[in-house]
Regions:
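Intrinsically disordered, low-complexity segments enriched in small/polar residues
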Residues: 75, 89, 97-101, 118, ...
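Canonical SH2 domain fold
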Residues: 90, 97-115, 124-125
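Negatively charged, low-complexity tracts enriched in Asp/Glu with abundant Ser/Thr
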Residues: 11-96
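Polybasic, proline/glycine-rich intrinsically disordered low-complexity segments
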Residues: 119-178
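A structural signal for the main folded, soluble domain(s) of proteins
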Residues: 70, 79, 92-94, 117-123, ...
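Contiguous mid-protein beta-loop-alpha structural module that forms a pocket-lining wall or clamp
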Residues: 2-3
Length: 178
């Protein structure tokens, strides 16, 4: 097996995450196909009917993460849900990646990016903190979930980032019990 190939166990974990987080078309996953929508149309803010602006209740986190030009090229196509199971809509404008919950249109993440040599850098992540729109409260979990969405979108091996996300959530649950 090549280093970047996923094991059957990794594929099952991916399915569990995709099912719980609603990224992609789970029926395609069962058929052994890529659950992420095909990149045949470039998503824009006008592609999805009910998107809303980032609320005033939000936090901004500085990032310093380099991603390839190829990855940005894929991300610029956006993510247009094909089925109800897919809970995310995403589009990019000139310098921002924007993720929305597809059912409600609530903006959850906005990430600024800049050109950096031959690649790009993710520089600033804005995270929704309106409790009426989004229940996230842990910055580390939110950064990890955002990175999972990005890695999955470009077809990368997202198993390790998923494990990190689950670990953060488990630690949060344990702290609540104390």
């Amino acid at each position: 097996m090549k280093n970047n190939e996923k094991t059957d166990e990794d594929k099952l974990k991916d399915f569990k995450l995709m099912w719980s987080m609603g990224l992609g078309h789970s029926g395609k996953f069962f058929e052994g196909k890529n659950p992420i929508p095909k990149k045949t149309e470039i998503a824009t803010k006008h592609t999805w009917k009910n998107i809303k602006n980032m609320p005033e209740q939000h936090v901004v986190v500085n990032l310093d993460m380099e991603i390839s030009t190829e990855m940005i090229g894929t991300l610029k196509y956006g993510h247009i849900p094909e089925e109800m199971e897919d809970h995310w809509f995403m589009y990019c404008d000139e310098d921002t990646i924007r993720y929305y919950r597809s059912w409600t249109g609530f903006c959850i993440y906005e990430c600024k990016f800049i050109k950096s040599g031959y690649n790009y850098k993710l520089t600033e992540l804005t995270i929704n903190r309106d409790p009426n729109q989004y229940g996230g409260k842990n910055i580390e979990a939110d950064i990890t979930l955002f990175m999972y969405l990005i890695i999955s979108e470009v077809g990368g091996n997202d198993s390790k980032i998923f494990e990190k996300y689950l670990k953060i959530l488990k630690e949060d649950d344990e702290k609540k019990k104390e």
